Amino acid sequence: SSIAGSMPGPLMCAYYSSKAYVLRLSEGIREELNKKKSNVKISVLQPGPVNTNFNNVAGVKFNLSSKSSEYVAKYAVENFLKGKFNIVPGFMIKCAKFLSKITPDFLVAKVCYHMQEKKK
């Protein structure tokens, strides 16, 4: 998934909504596995910007600094092995996720729109 799955995404609606789908699907599967007392464990990774070729291909720029793919992968594996379900690497991304939860959606949408518009 992505941190984008936790908030509305004006000007990148398809991307944000696809990440929200992955997040909700993972939450549903986790509950099904728990109810069946399965030994199968899953996690959902919600990084912010990751330093990959995605930026060039999608033609986007990120306001936050990106983490290396190596850092994100190591962080994800370490936290998965600790039994964490929702894995969010980086302090600033954790803050953004928290703020998006306590802020009304219409305000989050306005902020996201402004951030996306600035990237053009």
Residue ranges of model-derived segments:
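C-terminal helical subdomain
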Residues: V44, K61-K97
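Active-site loop immediately N-terminal to the catalytic Tyr-X3-Lys motif
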Residues: G9-C13
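Active-site-adjacent segment of SDR/Rossmann-fold oxidoreductases
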Residues: M7, G28-V40
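A transmembrane-helix-recognition feature enriched in membrane-embedded lipid enzymes
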Residues: G83-K118
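Short, flexible catalytic-loop segment of classical short-chain dehydrogenase/reductase
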Residues: P47-V57, F62
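Active-site helix of classical SDR
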Residues: S18
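Residue(s) in the substrate-gating loop at a strand-loop-helix junction
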Residues: S2
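Extended, polar beta-sheet/loop recognition surfaces of beta-rich domains
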Residues: S38-P49
